[in-house]
């Protein structure tokens, strides 16, 4: 019999992560690299493991992720969102705890666009009264 696989798609800023959960030992692979190798920041690795901590399933699933777009922070948020959605397929009873932790909600914050006449989105050149 084929091993059960659970899939989820996560998004954050410009990053899109396609996540597959397979029952296993807790190994996380991102774009065919180990998690520690792909994401060097420890705090972002904690962000990725949040859904497992909330549902008490640490070390129960191997995670295979394909992620494109964005930087480290956006990709970590997208992976977290994807893992949370995949865990929902594992057990629908996780919905309440994941929702309460805010892990099922797509973070809608995006980069503010640059306005004409300004140097950046809000930064203006120095004002001189005289």
UniProtKB/Swiss-Prot annotation:
Keywords assigned: Ribonucleoprotein, Ribosomal protein
Record flagged with keyword Protein biosynthesis: no
Residues forming coiled coils: none
Keyword Transferase: no
InterPro entries: Ribosomal_Su5_D2-typ_SF, Ribosomal_uS9, Ribosomal_uS9_bac/plastid, Ribosomal_uS9_CS, Ribsml_uS5_D2-typ_fold_subgr
GO function term, MF aspect, one: RNA binding
GO biological process: translation
UniProt xrefs under Pfam families: Ribosomal_S9
GO terms under cellular component: cytosolic small ribosomal subunit
HAMAP family named among the record's database cross-references: Ribosomal_uS9_B
Family matches, as NCBIfam families: PRK00132.1 (NF001099)
Family: Belongs to the universal ribosomal protein uS9 family.
UniProt protein name: Small ribosomal subunit protein uS9
UniProt source species: Streptococcus thermophilus (strain ATCC BAA-250 / LMG 18311)
Encoding gene per record: rpsI
């Amino acid at each position: 019999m084929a091993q059960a696989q659970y899939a989820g798609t996560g998004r954050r800023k410009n990053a899109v992560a396609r996540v597959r959960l397979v029952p296993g030992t807790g190994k996380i692979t991102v774009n065919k690299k180990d998690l520690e190798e792909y994401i060097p920041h420890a705090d972002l690795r904690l962000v990725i493991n949040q859904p497992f901590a909330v549902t008490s399933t640490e070390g129960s699933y191997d995670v295979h992720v394909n992620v494109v777009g964005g930087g480290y922070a956006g990709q970590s948020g997208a992976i977290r969102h994807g893992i949370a959605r995949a865990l929902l397929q594992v057990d629908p009873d996780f919905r309440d705890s994941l929702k309460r932790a805010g892990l099922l909600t797509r973070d809608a914050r995006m980069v503010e666009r640059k306005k004409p006449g300004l140097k950046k989105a809000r930064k203006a050149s120095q004002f001189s009264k005289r």
